[in-house]
């Protein structure tokens, strides 16, 4: 039985005849050998104790990545959105304080992050063509590229020709989480906007690859559907992408639901929730099955847990993150407003202390310097820069 995914020799593969959305349902009915291996490992009675998996995962990680941890920061540029997603603080019908940063304000935020050491920034925006309009992201990339060498995007899905243009302006990475791979749950949770289209989002990584992206991140938001189903689907998706988009590097993440605007009292459903031990087990399993994949853990997770898993398989961590536009410097706070049915509505009163509403609450509130110190204490080298244009000549 195949126990790991070997990327060697993939250049011989011809382009896929069908997109992942076309084969996904069939894969769930007839799992590949790698998926069957996942199912074996995820159950403790057949996969062995967590301690053994964690030790093996640590060894494989050191072999492929050395004793390093790549650090990045999300930079939210807009919390406007046309989608209604019942689990998201940016949801269209949420009565939140919204703003979209100007390009100059994006630069202000990025220079602040640069001063903290970051050279790897993820630009994040809600999906709203009126506010995050044609050319906006390109202008942001043009302004940041001279001093931020590693730029990635987490924005609404696009056509492959749009991705080609984005890549031409300096973006090298794209992150798109399916949220949930359970089609019925997805339909229930997404009630308005282009995000309603399950297959359009599912095939987004392939369009990004066709558009020229060579660093692609996928994941599911754990807590929306049964965590074992989500993890198996994520395994299937990652295996498909490795086989059919073989020139790209991939990262995978297992973000867990956190309190958010509209539901700050959020409590996880015990029937769906990914508990800590299972979370660590997934990190170890994905490392063993996909030795070359990057594994991302964000500040959604508590500091003690992040410290404990830093050496076990994780390769990328965010640090000091803010999940609202202007969160690092207060940029854009002078333009706060509501958006109702696509129309901007001014606030009736402003105290001067308001800020844009965050997408969700983070858990690890330590500064980037504190996270870096923690990593060094674990004998890991914090890596702030993860890309150089000269590497493009090698692809």
Task: Spell out what each predicted region is.
Residues 32-69:
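An N-cap/entry alpha-helix motif that binds or orients negatively charged groups
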Residues 42, 61, 114, 145, ...:
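N-terminal cationic-hydrophobic initiation segments that often serve targeting/anchoring roles
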Residues 1-47, 243-395:
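Auxiliary Fe-S-binding modules of radical SAM enzymes
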Residues 92-107, 113-209, 214-224, 246-253, ...:
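Core AdoMet radical
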Residues 159-168, 214, 225-240, 302-312:
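Catalytic cores of alpha/beta
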Residues 58, 73, 110, 137-141, ...:
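Generic structural signal for well-ordered alpha-helices
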Residues 63-105:
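Canonical Radical SAM [4Fe-4S] cluster-binding loop centered on the CxxxCxxC motif
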Residues 57, 85, 123, 176, ...:
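Conserved, mostly hydrophobic/aromatic
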